[in-house]
Amino acid sequence: MKFYYHDNDSSVDQCAPHDSGEPVTAEQLEKIGVLAFHYPDVEDVNRLAKERKYTNRDEVTITPEAMGGQENYEKKLKVFYEEHLHEDEEIRYILDGEGYFDVRDKDDRWIRAQLNAGDLLILPSGIYHRFTLSEKNYVHTMRLFQAEPKWVALPRPVDNNPYRQEYVKAISA
């Protein structure tokens, strides 16, 4: 697991590392409500799920083949990479492969989280973010939910959304 500021070089593919060379600490992530853990054993994930009342989960494999071919895969990656927020926490545990979550810091800069097998990331509701795979084009992830599984992405800007407003208030305190 590695965290750093995104280089914002739009001339390079979104699946490239985009490492600016400016690292981000766990403390910086916590200030924006992002939690990160490394759990080599799924039993650790089960304990966290019980503590945080995640009652549902599913698994998703993202590859060109799993998405029905290269064209569908590329369309899906574009959707994942559009900046958005959710009204629920987003919890992802990487079972295999590699992917990137980008989140906005308090100054609206992108922080990139490089996640590999065993890494778990919790994004608070209301945080602007996006997701993409690495250049390996493969990830197998577990999604955890506190209620029935849903994935409703609200594209930016939705600053008047009550979950967004609550999030901004929480990180401004």
UniProtKB/Swiss-Prot annotation:
CDD domains: cupin_ARD (cd02232)
Cytoplasm keyword on record: yes
GO biological process: L-methionine salvage from methylthioadenosine; methionine metabolic process
Location within or outside the cell: Cytoplasm; Nucleus
Binding site for Fe(2+): 84, 86, 90, 129
Gene Ontology, cellular component aspect: cytoplasm; nucleus
UniProt GO MF annotations: acireductone dioxygenase (Ni2+-requiring) activity; acireductone dioxygenase [iron(II)-requiring] activity; iron ion binding; nickel cation binding
Region annotation (Disordered) ranges: 1-21
Pathway recorded for this protein: Amino-acid biosynthesis; L-methionine biosynthesis via salvage pathway; L-methionine from S-methyl-5-thio-alpha-D-ribose 1-phosphate: step 5/6
Reactions catalysed according to its record: 1,2-dihydroxy-5-(methylsulfanyl)pent-1-en-3-one + O2 = 4-methylsulfanyl-2-oxobutanoate + formate + 2 H(+); 1,2-dihydroxy-5-(methylsulfanyl)pent-1-en-3-one + O2 = 3-(methylsulfanyl)propanoate + CO + formate + 2 H(+)
Cofactor note: Binds either 1 Fe or Ni cation per monomer. Iron-binding promotes an acireductone dioxygenase reaction producing 2-keto-4-methylthiobutyrate, while nickel-binding promotes an acireductone dioxygenase reaction producing 3-(methylsulfanyl)propanoate.
Cofactor(s) essential for the protein: Fe(2+); Ni(2+)
Statement: the UniProt record of this protein carries the keyword S-adenosyl-L-methionine: no
Binding-site positions, Ni(2+): 84, 86, 90, 129
Signal peptide location: none
Keywords, in A-Z order: Amino-acid biosynthesis, Cytoplasm, Dioxygenase, Iron, Metal-binding, Methionine biosynthesis, Nickel, Nucleus, Oxidoreductase
EC identifiers of the protein: 1.13.11.54, 1.13.11.53
Major localization listed first in the record, in broad terms: cytoplasm
PANTHER family documented for this protein: ACIREDUCTONE DIOXYGENASE
Family, as annotated: Belongs to the acireductone dioxygenase (ARD) family.
Function in brief: Catalyzes 2 different reactions between oxygen and the acireductone 1,2-dihydroxy-3-keto-5-methylthiopentene (DHK-MTPene) depending upon the metal bound in the active site. Fe-containing acireductone dioxygenase (Fe-ARD) produces formate and 2-keto-4-methylthiobutyrate (KMTB), the alpha-ketoacid precursor of methionine in the methionine recycle pathway. Ni-containing acireductone dioxygenase (Ni-ARD) produces methylthiopropionate, carbon monoxide and formate, and does not lie on the methionine recycle pathway.
Protein name as annotated: Acireductone dioxygenase
Organism from which the protein derives: Yarrowia lipolytica (strain CLIB 122 / E 150) (Yeast)
